[in-house]
Amino acid sequence: MSVKIQQISPGDLTLYASVSIAFEARSVYRVETREQGLGGLLLVEELVDPYIKDYDAQAEGNDRPNQWAQQFDLRQWGFLMAMDGERAAGGAAVVMNSPEVHMLENRSDLAVLWDMRVQPEQRGKGIGRRLFQHAAEWARVKGCT
């Protein structure tokens, strides 16, 4: 079945949250400075014993998608779902014009990809790339650069 990307409303965040964000990590990255920072920074990858990283399981308070409305005004947010028939295959959340999100610097021409997730059994099929492309287009249409 072909996967279709569609926009959903904040009322559908329970469906969005049903997509697992957990993944297996096999390395960590460490920042090294060169010449006390004057020579730049180097990102060094270190292999570690594999472990499961699950941001939803680590989330506190209102950090899970189905709780975002308790912390943020979602009227200017864009929510995209990748649907494989009736099954949620992935999702992306894009934020703009949200004063609570300080990285936007109260500018109306900026957007940020807040969250992106793809079901584990759907990974490696290009769904994340398609969600990213749709998220970028959503922001462009809204006037973000």
Listing of model-derived features with the role each one plays in the protein:
Residues 104-120:
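Conserved acetyl-CoA binding element of GNAT-fold acetyltransferases
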Residues 31-43, 84, 94-109:
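Conserved donor-binding loop and adjoining core beta-sheet/short helix segment
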Residues 1-50:
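Conserved N-terminal entry element of GNAT/NAT acetyltransferase domains
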Residues 33-79:
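Active-site rim helix/loop that mediates acceptor-substrate recognition in acyltransferases
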Residues 81, 87-96, 112, 117:
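Conserved beta-strand in the GNAT
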Residues 145:
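Short acidic/polar active-site loop segments enriched in Thr and Asp
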Residues 118, 124-137, 141:
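Conserved acetyl-CoA-binding loop-helix of GNAT-fold acetyltransferases
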